[in-house]
From Swiss-Prot:
Function comment: Lectin that binds L-rhamnose. Also binds monosaccharides possessing steric similarity to the hydroxyl group orientation at C2 and C4 of the pyranose ring structure of L-rhamnose, such as L-mannose and L-lyxose.
PROSITE patterns named in the record: SUEL_LECTIN
Species this protein is from: Silurus asotus
Ranges where the SUEL-type lectin domain occurs: 27-115, 123-213, 218-308
Record keywords: Glycoprotein, Lectin, Repeat, Secreted, Signal
Name by which UniProt lists this protein: Rhamnose-binding lectin
Length: 308
């Protein structure tokens, strides 16, 4: 099950108070280095805007014509794609390659981010590491194979092999998520044969950020009982419906299992309202509670959650 449709996962993490450590905002003039840092925890970008919304920010030594337009704002994902899940992140803004939302105006980047609890692994090229969640399930937050720092995995290497710090393999997140999501443990390798070579002539490394989650599946007519003991519940994802023809299928006619595109849009809200911030909760898996998103289909309730 691919839970990390990237935007929806990050939205859930941003809205998860139990995982939140702290938050910050960073403004960087175009051409300078944007530096995001978490004293404790890992970066999750909430929003990044490129443009200009006032005439004073990043205006020193700029002619009035370059700071006059203050209705210029382009939401971007580049910074989140590269920084999410890292404890520290430095990006040269003139290398981000974003579209110019207002030509002739001197712009800046305004990034708002949170620091969340999570697990972070760095694997040098040709190496491997095992991600381990014990009895819980892995959920990948972000991953990159390439190089964003000249210092990491650089011991004994000539400078020429570590100077390209704008190296990102576009398929890293989906590849690692496909290998690891939902598993208790997962071994990942930092190899060109797995991720391709995004920057030939540069020695690369793999960074992976993940959280450990629990999962519960209850067939229609049953009840989901969650117990986090001394901790409290935080719902990460939930759906009442059917997305798999084999789950909760025993003794059911095939006609009740065919529709695997059945979702209840407010499942997460209802489960969160009944469970979040509590140590225990019980949620019924029935049409009376959730409504019937797909008549004549036998449904089930799937909840992914963390104890925080």
């Amino acid at each position: 099950m691919m839970l990390i449709l990237k935007l929806s996962l990050l939205s859930l993490l941003i809205a998860t108070p139990g995982l939140l450590v702290s938050g910050a905002n960073m403004i960087t003039c175009y051409g300078d280095v944007q530096k995001l840092h978490c004293e404790t925890g890992l970066i999750i970008v909430k929003s990044s805007l490129y443009g200009r919304t006032d005439s004073t920010t990043c205006s020193t030594n700029r002619p009035p014509a370059q700071v006059a337009v203050t209705t210029c704002s382009l939401p971007i994902t580049t910074i989140g794609d590269r920084c999410n899940g890292l404890p520290d992140c430095e990006l040269k803004t003139d290398l981000l390659g974003n579209t110019d939302p207002c030509q002739g105006t001197y712009k800046y980047y305004n990034t708002s981010f949170d620091c969340i609890n999570g697990n972070y692994a760095v694997i040098c090229e040709h190496g491997y590491s095992t991600l381990d969640c014990g009895n819980d399930a892995i959920l990948i937050v972000n991953a990159n194979y390439g190089r964003a720092s000249s210092q990491i995995c650089s011991n004994g290497l000539p400078n020429g092999l570590t100077q390209n710090t704008n190296c990102y393999a576009a398929n890293t997140l989906t590849t690692v998520a496909g290998l690891c999501n939902g598993k208790k443990s997962c071994t990942v390798e930092a190899l060109n044969t797995i991720f391709s070579d995004p920057c030939s002539g540069t020695v690369k490394y793999l960074t992976v950020t993940y959280i450990c989650t629990k999962e519960m599946v209850v067939c229609e007519g049953g009840s989901a009982s969650i117990n986090c003991g001394a901790q409290t519940i935080k719902t990460i994802w939930a759906n009442y419906g059917r997305t798999d023809s084999t789950v909760c299928s025993t003794g059911r006619p095939g006609s009740q299992l065919l529709n695997t595109n059945c979702y209840t849009s407010d499942t997460l809200n209802k489960v969160a309202a009944g469970c979040d911030h509590l140590s225990t909760c019980t949620i019924p898996a029935n049409n009376n509670f959730f409504g019937d998103p797909c008549p004549n289909t036998y449904k089930y309730l799937r909840i992914v959650y963390a104890c925080v």
